[in-house]
């Protein structure tokens, strides 16, 4: 509910920053131009790694690097033109292919048939259309990751931002999951280029892994 968070910030005169990295290219971006600070990263759209953007309003202006006057004086240093062009191309392509949740929903239906007792997080809430997070009925998530890797699929135990952190997820704890259940948490995400067959193959691979573990 970013708009509600923005309203609270406006009430107390605090600039509002929205990290739209997971949003862009997956859902329409109406209203985001009202944010004081808006950031995103283009590798999530299939663009080059290491290139992102910061959009500011007069209320949210911030200078990141001092020195030269590149990029309206906000970030000194020579611009990475090839990556910028690649970023724009990925954004244009992804906006032509705005995703819906049909493939993710098909994946979740198929996995439910193959793995009894699986629990999907936020199933009744508005979610990103190409991300599915779930708690598996048995086995440590690292065993699942290793087995899925051998089957040709890369899945994760959480966001890249949490890599290297010890202990169960504080987010899962806040949602009421026990530390033991949190150790069975797995997340998968797709891109705009993934087809229905890719999602079905991923679901079937989870079924194979379930039988093999």
Segments (PLM) and residue ranges:
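Pyridoxal 5′-phosphate
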Residues: 1-213
